[in-house]
Structures are given as C-alpha cells and as structure tokens.
UniProtKB/Swiss-Prot annotation:
A motif (VHIID) lies at residues 335-339. It comes from Arabidopsis thaliana (Mouse-ear cress). Residues 523-597 are annotated as: SAW. Residues 225-285 are annotated as: Leucine repeat I (LRI). Expressed in seedlings, roots, shoots, leaves, flowers and siliques. This is Scarecrow-like protein 5.
Length: 597
C-alpha cells in the first residue's frame, strides 16, 4: 500500500491553505513513508517464517557463449559457462506481487544467496552469507542475512544519516521510532509556522525540503508505471548517497519488478540487485562469489544452449568470424588459429567442416585455444577435452589437425606461449573477450592495447573481432546505468519473443546467463568491474593505433548471416557499415563483427 502517494498531495494542499504549518507537513510526509515501510516489513517477516534453507543453485557465465555440439549428438549441445548465481524474489503473478521489503537487512541480494559457502566482502572481513531455497513451484525465494549492510541498520548516535526506511528490523526499535515521530508530530501541529523551526528538522524535510522535485518526479513515474524512470531516479539517489530517498525508491521498486513479468520488469529485478549491492559496497564480493561455485548438476549446463538457440547473437558472431577466416586462408596449406576464448571449441565445428570440403583438399589446421583456467569446471575438465573433441571431428572430415591448449588469462599472454611457426597462415579470433581486458583507465599496464600490439607483431593474415555494441567502459555511473538498461532491455525483449514467460527454463537462462553481467556493470568499479564494453568506433581507434587495417567482410558472409536471420523474428536488423556487420533488435545495434589484418 503506497500511503505516500495519497498523503503527500493532500498534506501539501492543506499547507497551501494555511491549515497546517510547514513543520507539520514535513513530519506528516515522513510519518507516511515510515508507516508504509512498517506495513510492508511486517508483511515480509510473516512470509519469511515459512522459508526453508537449502543449497543454492549455480549460474552460468556469459563468457561461454558456445554450444557443445562437437559430437553432433543432441545431448552434447549444451552451452557451458563459468559458475555464478542470481536470486530474486519471484511472485506467483505480477499483479499479486508483494515484495515491499523496506529494510536493507531484509532485502535479498546476490551475496545473501551464496549457498553454504562464505565469501568475504571487501569492507567486512567477518561477513557471512545465508542460504537460499526454492519453493515447490520453483520460485526463487531467499532470506537475507547480509552483514555488509549493517552500517545502514545500526541506530547509533554517531550515525546521523540513518533513514527511517533503512533501520533495523527489530520490532522494539521500530516501535520506539514510531512513538518519537508521533510525539514530534503532535508538538509540531501545536506550534506556529516558523520557517527556522522547519529548517532545523531532520529527516526527509531537512534533506529535500517538504517534498523534493526528485520525489515528486518519482511519484509521478510510479503512478504511471514508468519503471525505467524510477530505476534511474534510484540510481541517482544511490550515486548521491541519499539514503532516505534510496530506501523509499527501493521499497517502491520491489513492488514493480518481477523475474516473471514484462522484459523491463525482469531486467529491473537484476538492476535493483545491482543498486543494492553497490550501495552496500558489496558488488565486488558478490561478483567473485558468483564465479567460484561448482556446478551442481548437468541440467545447469543447458542454459547457454537454450539462449544460443533462442537468439541469433552468438551464431551471428561465430559465423561471421568463420567466414572472414575461411576467406583469408582459402589458398593456404597450413593454417594456425589462435582463439583467445576457446571455451568448448564449438565455434570451429562449422569451419572444420567447411575446410574439409574445400576444393583441392583441406589444409593442415592447428588451433591454439586460450581460456581462463578458472573455467575448467565448466567443461568438467581441462582444455585437453576440447582438443579431443575437435580432433575427432577433424578426423571425420579428413582434416589434418593439431591442438594446443593454453590455460591462462589473456592478461598473461606472451608471444612465446602462442607457439607460432613459420610458414603458417595465422588467424586470430577475439570472440566477446576483449571487453574483459582492462585498459588505460583501469591499470597502467593497459592490457587491452598491449594485447593488440602483441598480435600485430605476429603479422596475422586476419584478426576477427566480435563485441557487444555498448559504451560502458569509461562512462560514469549514471550514463553507464542508462546504457546498461537500454542495451539489456533489448536483449530481454528479444528473448521474450522466443521463450514464453511460463517457459520453465527462461528465468534460469536470464538469471544465469545475463544477470551476472548486469550486476557487475552496476555494482562494481575499478579492477572489480570486468564488463567494459566499447562501441565499434572505439575499437576501430584501438586497432588503428596498433597498426591494423580493416579487412572488410565479404558479401558471402553478409548473405550467410541474412539466411541465418530468416528463422528468427523480423524485428532483428542487420546492417553493413564500413566493412563491418551490426546485428540489432528494432534497429538498436547490439553486437558487431569485423575483421582486420
């Protein structure tokens, strides 16, 4: 129940008529917000008593957008990604949703749902994580126990910025605050209207005047259901460390978002998680915790494959890169491919088959597969498994084949580790990986540009780049928040077309494959923020500075991608610009592919 929506306009009209003074106006507004919080909090605790605790499931990371179809069996088409988890309250229906949990201590964050493991927080060495359980209808429900938010929950005299909505969940404390607030209200209504007295009042009135323009704006957005606008206002409040405004907006947003609702509601649930984590300074700990868990069952390995089939983004990237490589080595007898994110090796299935059918006979193919050693659990083994699978496929296609696995981070790559040989045509592949490399804005090493210069020194025949078309690298928090919202909302909308909202795996796909990126973009800063996308224009500048020249994609590649999109929604758009391809949703570019030499 949003009492403030009704009380605030009524109170201000009474003030304008001279019926009550400004001091009383401020206290009435504050009282309505507090009462609204108390009602919602009691509702939450009555529900939370029924929550059981089990071990949390695992999420898959967006670093592994490849199908495991090397054995060409349906049971081996699973996409495998790095482990992570994402939880959010899921109501039985959007209209009946009641997620109005006012206190930070009661709010479910990713960190609070980290299973039975304990992950230390940056700002709290004694942090402990609670467990999470699933209800019988597979709705993710968790009971938070987040010590990282304790500074918002402790009502000590030294803390003057405590919000009435962010206090401790203890009943006695709430009753004491409510009694004091009622006494202040009674006193204020008996006093004359003195501006100085009003100006000396604390709480919402002191920080915002009677009702700030931001609050009016937010209330109007809430009344018309403008979820994007309310999310933006909450992000502004978080950036300004405006705890009272943030608390109130979080309580409203909890009633507006849903992991089973419209695309904007589903994305909003994860963006809200990111905002709460950022405010608690726990984003980096959450992100690390999401990456270090082990798989709990083979069914979790299917999520990326579902996304791979539902949307053409990754097929677009792989097929366009393979087309450029096939064109560049069409007359070569010895081909060496360096893949800077080999994952399952699924990208190379179609290329090996194409090379096996090449007129004049196949070339000798050697692949150097680089992958972060942390991802070995996703394959349930080391890179030798990738080599074995690709080797079997190459043998079936009559392609002489050799594989070398390099289990190291891209920031650790040196020339001597790549095994380059004279007389080989060299192709280098960067599939959705360079945006994870820190640049000059993060570290003096500037691994992003260093890696490009290193590759240029190898004199490759072709270098392929596939990246998300977004500007989140050096953008300040608020512009980055808006960019994240616009980019991922288009992705969520495209998923909505293919996977019904009652699809039993859709929530898992979005939580495990996309939410991790969203939380990292919003909650983390500095070296902890690994998602650092750049638009193609900036990548062009980097490649030019490293000494590369464009290698325009052929018309054959363009035709191949157009044929691919025929089996998907007509809302997908394909644009060729300056030798590069842009795949978008409703004319909003989401992913780009280009080649260099």
């Amino acid at each position: 129940m949003r009492l403030s929506v009704f009380i605030i306009p009524l109170v201000e009209s009474r003030q304008a008529s001279g019926i009550i003074n400004k001091q009383s106006t401020s206290l009435l507004i504050r009282f309505s917000l507090y009462l609204e919080a108390s009602i919602s909090t009691k509702s939450f605790f009555s529900k939370s008593q029924r929550i059981s605790q089990t071990q949390s499931p695992i999420c898959l990371s967006a670093n592994y957008y490849q199908p495991d179809n090397l054995d060409m069996e349906a049971t081996q088409k699973h996409m495998i990604q790095e482990g992570s988890s994402m939880f959010y309250h899921q109501p039985s229906s959007v209209k009946q949703m009641d997620l109005s949990v006012q206190t930070f201590d009661s709010y479910c964050t990713l960190e609070s749902s980290s299973g039975t493991k304990s992950h230390p927080c940056l700002n709290n060495k004694n942090n402990s994580s609670s467990t999470t359980s699933f209800s019988s209808n597979e709705s993710p429900i968790s009971q938070a126990n987040n010590n990282n938010l304790s500074r918002f929950n402790n009502h000590s005299p030294e803390e003057n910025n405590n919000s009435p909505l962010s206090g401790s969940s203890a009943t006695n404390t709430n009753e004491t605050e409510l009694s004091l607030m009622l006494k202040d209200l009674e006193t204020a209504m008996m006093e004359p209207d003195v501006d100085n007295s009003y100006n000396n009042q604390g709480g919402f009135g002191q920080q915002h005047g009677v009702v700030s323009s931001a609050m009016y704006r937010s209330m109007e957005m809430i009344s018309r259901g403008d979820l994007k606008g309310v999310l933006y206002e909450c992000a502004k409040a978080v950036e300004n460390y405006d705890l009272e405004m943030t608390d109130w907006l979080i309580s409203q947003l909890q009633q507006m978002v849903s992991v089973s609702g419209e695309p904007v509601q589903r994305l909003g649930a994860y963006m809200l998680e990111g905002l709460v984590a950022r405010l608690a300074s726990s984003g980096s700990s959450i992100y690390k915790a999401l990456r270090c868990k082990d798989p709990t069952g083979p069914e979790l390995l299917t999520y990326m494959h579902i996304l791979y089939e539902a949307c053409p983004y990754f097929k677009f990237g792989y097929e366009s890169a393979n087309g450029a490589i096939a064109e560049a080595v069409k007359n070569e007898s010895f081909v060496h491919i360096i893949d800077f994110q080999i994952s399952q090796g699924g990208q190379w299935v179609s290329l090996i088959r194409a090379l096996g059918a090449r007129p004049g006979g196949p070339p000798n193919v050697r692949i150097t597969g680089i992958d972060d050693p942390r991802s070995s659990f996703a394959r349930q083994g080391g890179l030798e498994l990738v080599g074995q699978r690709l080797g079997k496929l190459a043998e079936m296609c009559g392609v002489p084949f050799e594989f070398h696995g390099a289990a190291l981070c891209c920031t650790e790559v040196e020339i001597e580790k790549l095994g380059v040989r004279n007389g080989e045509a060299l192709a280098v592949n960067f599939p959705l990986v360079l945006h994870h490399m820190p640049d000059e804005s993060v570290t003096v090493e500037n691994h992003r540009d260093r890696l490009l210069r290193l590759v240029k020194h190898l004199s490759p025949n072709v270098v392929t780049l596939v990246e998300q078309e977004a500007n989140t690298n050096t953008a300040p928090f608020l512009p980055r928040f808006v960019e994240t919202m616009n980019h991922y909302l288009a992705v969520f909308e495209s998923i909505d077309v293919k996977l019904a909202r009652d699809h039993k795996e859709r929530i898992n796909v979005e939580q495990h494959c996309l939410a991790r990126e969203v939380v990292n973009l919003i909650a983390c800063e500095g070296v902890e923020r690994e998602e650092r996308h750049e638009p193609l224009g900036k990548w062009r500048s980097r490649f030019h500075m490293a000494g590369f020249k464009p290698y325009p994609l052929s018309s054959y590649v363009n035709a191949t991608i157009k044929g691919l999109l025929e089996s998907y929604s007509e809302k997908y758009t394909l644009e060729e610009r300056d030798g590069a391809l842009y795949l978008g949703w409703k004319n909003q570019p989401l992913i780009t592919s280009c080649a260099w030499r």
